[in-house]
Amino acid sequence: MAALQEKKSCSQRMEEFRHYCWNPDTGQMLGRTLSRWVWISLYYVAFYVVMTGLFALCIYVLMQTIDPYTPDYQDQLKSPGVTLRPDVYGEKGLEIHYNISDNRTWTSLTHTLRSFLAGYSPAAQVDNINCTSKTYFFQESFGAPNHTKFSCKFTADMLENCSGLTDPSFGFKEGKPCFIIKMNRIVRFLPSNSTPPRVDCTFLDMPHQALTPLQVEYYPPNGTFSLHYFPYYGKKAQPHYSNPLVAAKLLNVPTNTEVVVLCKILADHVTFDNPHDPYEGKVEFKLKIQK
Amino acid sequence: MAGGAHRGGGRWGAPHSPAPPGPRGCPVPLKAAAQSLCRKPTWGQYCTLLLFQRKLEIYSVEHHAATDIKKKEGRDGKKDNDLELKRNQQKEELKKELDLDVSLQFAFVLFVFQGLSSTRAAELLAQNGPNALTPPKQTPEIIKFLKQMVGGFSILLWVGAVLCWIAFGIQYVSNPSASLDSVYLGTVLAVVVILTGIFAYYQEAKSTNIMASFCKMIPQQAVVIRDSEKKVIPAEQLVVGDIVEIKGGDQIPADIRLLSAQGCKVDNSSLTGESEPQSRSSEFTHENPLETKNITFYSTTCQRVFRCTATGMVINTGDRTIIGRIASLASGVGNEKTPIAIEIEHFVHIVAGVAVSVGILFFIIAVCMKYHVLDAIIFLIAIIVANVPEGLLATVTVALSLTAKRMAKKNCLVKNLEAVETLGSTSIICSDKTGTLTQNRMTVAHLWFDNQIFVADTSEDNLNQGFDQSSGTWTSLSKIIALCNRAEFKPGQESVPIMKRVVVGDASETALLKFSEVILGDVMEIRKRNHKVVEIPFNSTNKFQLSIHQTEDPNDKRFLLVMKGAPERILEKCSTIMINGKEQPLDKSMAQAFHTAYMELGGLGERVLGFCHFYLPADEFPETYSFDSESMNFPTSNLCFVGLLSMIDPPRSTVPDAVTKCRSAGIKVIMVTGDHPITAKAIAKSVGIISANSETVEDIAKRCNIAVEQVNKRDAKAAVVTGMELKDMSPEQLDELLANYPEIVFARTSPQQKLIIVEGCQRQDAVVAVTGDGVNDSPALKKADIGVAMGITGSDAAKNAADMILLDDNFSSIVTGVEEGRLIFDNLKKTIAYTLTKNIAELCPFLIYIILGLPLPIGTITLLFIDLGTDIIPSIALAYEKAESDIMNRKPRHKKKDRLVNQQLAVYSYLHIGLMQALGAFLVYFTVYAQQGFRPTSLFHLRIAWDSDHLNDLEDNYGQEWTSYQRQYLEWTGYTAFFVGIMVQQIADLIIRKTRKNSIFKQGLFRNKVIWVGIASQIIVALLLSYGLGSITALNFTMLKAQYWFVAVPHAILIWVYDEMRKLFIRLYPGSWWDKNMYY
């Protein structure tokens, strides 16, 4: 095996490599002549065109099998997530810190709320209908124009004191901030059997913190999502659908201490005990108001 | 062997002028005393009690060359002057080569009765060490283990693991709450490396252990005289100067100078390759220590001869014995890398090269795409992990050990796992003759009587003696053979087949005894009926053996004198010859016929014996006549010549077939032996190493009646080269010889010359196998790419030096080894192709993730579950695949051209099947996402939003909103889907890899059951991971819906169809563009 272990000098190797790149005797470049390269490239082009075509065909067939209105499976969206506005994230989750006396610290927060509520202006909701029913708004047929279904109006003024209309500072100025809680959409999801889902915010008990129970003012009253916003029929059927919201105005937040607020959605089919998902059926945030 | 005694010099026999006192020298007065003692005739015998200190730099076994020529001369008087010249040359060569510095010293003189004193012995033992060969240096276990830890891909994975930890470290510094994912990954990688390392080490150790247990010998005992008493001590404790006693059947415990010996013969075959036992006596006969009769060597055996006893003094112990020196010559030869190790290294380089270059390329791309450097490092690691087949090296080890096990069942014990394949790529086998090609046992081969040569059966069982036995001459001859023989079966062996019985007696008598036992039946009974009156045993002076018997016929009162011996001596004593049972005068024409037959048999390399008898006239020798063997008071001339019988150490019956098979497998078989050229050539011819119609230069010269020089060397296909000729050859000449002659026999070669021959073969880019059993073979065994030692007759030195041991000493097991080696090479190709294929399917997700921003299709940990979970058993299963076509009819692979992993294999695996697999797996992935609400088109460039922990209402195509964890879970489902997609297609990949050229249907889908075990294991592991462990989030598996398992099935079928097409075109258009590019 001595022959295999012969050490080649660097120049020899370079020479070999150059010979490999261009072999003047046989006219080979990188081990193949030009015509061979053309042939092999043609083969690969053809092969990949066919493979891509087959793949595209498969995807096309897949898309044909998919219902445009309802996803085939919703097993991974059993319970809706809950989000909070304003949403400022710290190292671990939502952290909302601001200083009452320094409006720069909270104008960005109110700005977030305002821009979020822009989608709930009467102009934006013009295509939706007014709903008053206290029960689910089932629509089996496509009654709305353009083969769609009706969506119920939800306008910002339904949030009253937290709508930003009466109080542009959303209560941040006086240390009684408004937080808007939104429940994620799930197609054809029915949150509860009869009573409408309701938001419930509390202080999360922290050790060494004796807090008085959190006092909250909910808008709409009782902090409920009216059942007529459900079920959601999907983007294609309800292109103008807007999520119902609940605003929670926290009335007795102690200043200069960080508190943890937990807002849950109480409904028969909304769970908030998934240990892995902190945003399923509930939202938790740290709040620190300085004076 | 008789004669050849050069009584010059007297270096070994007579006392010498005192040499300067050596380091261990005794006081001068003692020496003088010794000398004076020696002059007295009584003590002369014991004067040889000297301690010799000699330096034997080079060992040679050419000591028989001179005698050989002499013998030839004896047979053929016509040999001319150039032979004489040659002989003189040879003598000179002999001296040169031996280069002996025989400086003898009186160290101490002892009386044989007294022996050494125990204290002196203990001193010497402490000084010189035990009388045992130093075992070859072993690599420390810890080094072996560490080698496994950093060998192959391990180093790459270690780098990956360390990078993971570094990445985490940096993350941690900037953000103490950084996720531990990269720590987990790093740890998992480290664990993988350590586990595969431990596994490989365990496999390696297991096969080494088999060897260790095999090598363990029963401790040898020696009878020694110490403190004037006989003691039995372990041979290890022998020291120089000990007086030992040896009897028949013993192994010689050290190099011994015989002081007295009776009828002893030693079997030197392990040292010199001669199958005939050499007689030993206390006489000094030759300057050459290897040749002189009064020295016996360590580890040779004393023949089980009747009443053999000897006393001798130990002159060398342990490593200083001849055997020890040859063994150290062997250990000086470096261990070369095995061909398969080189191939695997080559493969590792390719894969590591691809992994690192793709990794770095995408690292740069990722950095350019404004990814965070830490993320880019994580990508780099993922790409490396995806590219490295973590389980493959362990799989290769298992595949090799499976083959090793299979070979062990067929009596090939493999010491070094990697050697399993080496036989398969072997292109030259240098085989020793004695004991490998031959049975190492003299057997009757031919008979000549009634002026006719008869062929006897020389096969192992010897039962089919089909020659004509009706002649009256045969009756007489058979009687002589049975009676004029001193050998006896050891009692109590009635149930043992005749050829396997143990006989007390020398080799040729044993052969004759067995021969007559087979033909005549109970020889002992015959001898009893023909009572022996007197006998003269064989000795080298009169060269015949004679005995006189009463006949079994009660009416015949005559005595029968039977005699056997050297044919020319027997013929001299005869005046008549028996033809067809009748005595005829021995005329000139009869004598000529005798000579022709004698020459013919001698030319076959056989040892010829003549037989004659004589019925003593009853009147001169009445029943009461008292015969005396000393005075020989009976006629020993004018006898009646009956016949000739020739014996040879016959080839094993399986060897010719095996040699033919090697030939058709493109393997050149070269015989390298220490034995005589004539015998070597005869055996070479009879086993087919020299084929029937090929001639040597000498043969042509003889046929055409011209001088050897005039012959065109190109006409000769075969060559018989002696060690003498070899010595004069330059390496270039040897290369030319090896390249030009397809059939070569090397005779009378020394251990170094064997080494030179092996090196010469290796210069031809050949992979060389050497077979041998003797100590003299051990350097060559070590030097060879694969050394094959004989398990039964093999010496320990040979077994130590070898990589493989044939437990049944059967050369044809080598053919099995070649077959298995070739098969495992092919199957490893399949295994590697199988394993490499999915690398693309594992790599693409990361590339697509980086470039197109899809949610990650498969995680790094999940990849490891493919590499080390589902794919392990299937890739081992490919090792059980049967050969596709007759692998024994193709040439051995060229070790530089036919690589294990070639360009075609890599390209076809990566760019064809691998790509198809990737597409299939992506299809499953897209299906899962689409059915959950994310259409393929919406996934592109979704990565940033998708991976953001702070976005808990990501909208899908239906307007549904997903929290971060919900997306995460979907991503894991995607991993599982992708995993299942790869797994399903790997089943197809496994099936197509069963063959490289033939259709799967020709190979048979169900012939290799293990493949189906593999497929079942793949599915079961995947099911377990998905459904059993799906709830453990750390593993990133989820319970996948049943239908997703079938999404990739059409792709799997497509892979199968595509590969069948590939194979079809390869078969239809061999040598075409397609064949060149698509056949791996």
From Swiss-Prot, chain A:
Residues the record marks as carrying a glycan: N99, N103, N130, N146, N161, N193, N222
Q: What cellular component terms from Gene Ontology apply here?
A: apical plasma membrane; endoplasmic reticulum; plasma membrane; sodium:potassium-exchanging ATPase complex
Q: What does the entry report about post-translational modification of this chain?
A: N-glycosylation is necessary for assembly and functional expression of the pump at the plasma membrane.
Q: Does the keyword Transport apply?
A: yes
Q: What is the effect of changing C21S?
A: Has no effect on pump ATPase activity
Q: What is the effect of changing N146Q?
A: Loss of pump ATPase activity
Please verify whether the record's keywords include Cell inner membrane: no
Q: Which residues lie on this side of the membrane: Cytoplasmic?
A: 1-36
Effect seen on changing C263S:
Impairs the assembly of an active pump and its targeting to the plasma membrane
The compartments listed are: Apical cell membrane; Cell membrane
Listed GO MF terms:
ATPase activator activity; P-type potassium:proton transporter activity
The family line of this record is: Belongs to the X(+)/potassium ATPases subunit beta family.
According to its UniProt entry, what is the function of this protein? The beta subunit of the gastric H(+)/K(+) ATPase pump which transports H(+) ions in exchange for K(+) ions across the apical membrane of parietal cells. Plays a structural and regulatory role in the assembly and membrane targeting of a functionally active pump. Within a transport cycle, the transfer of a H(+) ion across the membrane is coupled to ATP hydrolysis and is associated with a transient phosphorylation of the alpha subunit that shifts the pump conformation from inward-facing (E1) to outward-facing state (E2).
This protein's name: Potassium-transporting ATPase subunit beta
